[in-house]
Amino acid sequence: MVDELELAILIGLQASGKTTFCHRMLADDHLVVSKDAFRNARHPQRRQMRLVHEALAARRCVVVDNTNPSPQEWEPLIGAARVHGAVTVGYWFPPDLPAALDRNAAREGRSRVPDVGVYDTLKRLRRPRYVDGFDRLYEVRFDGKGGFRVEPMPPEGRQP
């Protein structure tokens, strides 16, 4: 059992640090669900949602490690969290296209995404907001020392 059931949604471009952040900061106490783990599945969205629902029903925290660029991807996840009484936390990785393309170019095999895929995600990428249904939002950036800087995002209307 957990004190607070949580669904974490990572939001950002490919090669923005989401998976590294996930494994360093969340994987110890969250089930990691990523469509990358079942690329050959016939219905990856359906499989992802089944895993999310099963974990939350078992009172297990979940992190969804995909690009999740827009409300179209968030809404079903936020809905699942609500059904199970979970808090929805968004981790926003602001786009840095040149750096993401450089990191992506250094990847090998199936982990490398064609550049057109990164550009397509950038076109759809939207900063998450509390009005989208998130209970908490954080902005995640590289700290320049091999780690991450995580800062709470203020509610809309109160941004510095």
Q: What is the role of each PLM region?
A:
Residues 70-103:
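Mid-chain, well-packed structural core segment of small domains
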Residues 32-35, 85-87, 112:
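Short hydrophobic/aromatic-enriched beta-strand-loop microsegments
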Residues 8, 61, 87-89:
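Short active-site oxyanion
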Residues 50-51, 76, 120, 124:
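Alpha-helical elements of Rossmann-like donor-binding domains used by nucleotide-donor carbohydrate transfer enzymes
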Residues 11, 16-72:
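Conserved substrate/cofactor phosphate-moiety recognition/catalytic segment
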Residues 1-11, 16, 27-28, 83, ...:
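Conserved GTP-binding G-domain of TRAFAC-class P-loop NTPases and closely related GTPase folds
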